Amino acid sequence: MSSLSKEAVMVHEALLARGLETPLRGALLDRDTRKQRIAEHMTEIMNLLSLDLSDDSLAETPTRIAKMYVDEIFSGLDYANFPKITIIENKMKVDEMVTVRDITLTSTCEHHFVTIDGKATVAYIPKDGVIGLSKLNRIVQFFSQRPQVQERLTQQILVALQTLLGTNNVAVSIDAVHYCVKARGIRDATSATTTTSLGGLFKSSQNTRQEFLRAVRHHN
């Protein structure tokens, strides 16, 4: 991980220490090799489904899927893609809650590889540093771009922000629709799943917790 940013390494190590890192076998192959091998295996899967890859509509599908997996929907498996983060000195001594609501996210269920579609609310109480608001969105997006379970995703975002901001006072809530429930199995088109992860004052102070939960309910 020597070529990765300091922030990426810090977050990865913090997740490993807490048993919250996404299960990985080891070092990733280079990007082009991953695409090539995924395309080869996807070709075999499509052949097993008796799809005719000589058809012009299907011919490039294995390559498209490989590119989508590596460059887009699973790009968060590679810490080389971790967003560039700058923590700004808290010169204004902000000590009240900073909340960003309605952060859209699209992830992939690791059990069936179908879509998770939702929104996140993220809050923190600054200590020595503050973070650009768009970076909160980017961190949510980074961890969403992996095969995921919603509970782990929520905690990964929490620990990443705690690590970067140097404070436990972080809270994350995600409300999402799982297409493994909506599009298959029970085929429930209306249910949604909410997960919440609280740290520091958000867990120990009832008033702080309630202020955050009111913000969550506001966007719902």
Swiss-Prot record:
It is an enzyme of class 3 (hydrolase). Pathway: Cofactor biosynthesis; 7,8-dihydroneopterin triphosphate biosynthesis; 7,8-dihydroneopterin triphosphate from GTP: step 1/1. GO terms for molecular function: GTP binding; GTP cyclohydrolase I activity; zinc ion binding. GO terms for biological process: one-carbon metabolic process; tetrahydrobiopterin biosynthetic process; tetrahydrofolate biosynthetic process. Pfam families: GTP_cyclohydroI. Keywords: GTP-binding, Hydrolase, Metal-binding, Nucleotide-binding, One-carbon metabolism, Zinc. PROSITE patterns: GTP_CYCLOHYDROL_1_1, GTP_CYCLOHYDROL_1_2. Zn(2+) binds at C109, H112, C180. One of its GO terms (cellular component) is cytoplasm. Its EC number is 3.5.4.16. Homomer. Belongs to the GTP cyclohydrolase I family. This is GTP cyclohydrolase 1. It comes from Pectobacterium carotovorum subsp. carotovorum (strain PC1).
